[in-house]
């Protein structure tokens, strides 16, 4: 399942890089977003593995067919995960007013709760509700992940 998440993150980042001038997103904001997603994915998968270990010790049925690699999930992206604690991580990008409110939009670090990552096809507003059509994504509710090819939803804002 980790490979699916990695592919979706890479696809979203590559599309953002292609249209960065049109949507007014700087390279630094894109890199910060990618790093934040990777950190959260690593934290989520580590907590999922820890929970799985506890379930198997208690004798409950867990996921079948999963094997934990000896390197751990942190190496799934090809190296040590970058964190904001690493010295000099963002010194090339400098401070930017554009991304100053990203932590409010993305949320605070810690428990990610429920999340959905996907591509959108269209968004319409009708009768005070946003009607959305999504494609190629996954939704994580609790500890259960659902992969979907297309989805529709109504949102009240």
Swiss-Prot record:
It is found in: Nucleus. CDD domains: TFIIA_alpha_beta_like. InterPro entries: TFIIA_asu/bsu, TFIIA_b-brl. One of its GO terms (biological process) is transcription initiation at RNA polymerase II promoter. Signal peptide: none annotated. Coiled coil: none annotated. Keywords: Nucleus, Transcription. GO terms for cellular component: transcription factor TFIIA complex. Its main location: nucleus. TFIIA is a heterodimer of the large subunit and the small subunit gamma. Belongs to the TFIIA subunit 1 family. TFIIA is a component of the transcription machinery of RNA polymerase II and plays an important role in transcriptional activation. This is Transcription initiation factor IIA large subunit. The gene is TOA1.
């Amino acid at each position: 399942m980790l490979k699916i998440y990695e592919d979706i993150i890479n696809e979203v980042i590559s599309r953002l890089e292609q249209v960065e001038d049109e949507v007014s997103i700087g390279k630094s904001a894109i890199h910060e977003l990618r790093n934040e997603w990777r950190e959260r994915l690593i934290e989520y998968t580590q907590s999922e593995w820890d929970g799985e270990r506890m379930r198997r010790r208690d004798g409950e049925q867990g996921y079948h067919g999963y094997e934990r690699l000896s390197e751990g999930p942190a190496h799934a992206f090809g190296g040590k995960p970058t964190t904001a604690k690493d010295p000099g991580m963002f010194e090339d990008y400098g401070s930017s007013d554009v991304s100053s409110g990203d932590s409010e939009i993305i949320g605070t670090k810690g428990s990610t709760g429920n999340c959905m990552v996907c591509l959108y096809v269209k968004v319409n507003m009708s009768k005070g509700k946003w009607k959305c059509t999504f494609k190629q994504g996954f939704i994580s509710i609790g500890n259960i992940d659902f992969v979907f090819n297309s989805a529709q939803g109504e949102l009240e804002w």
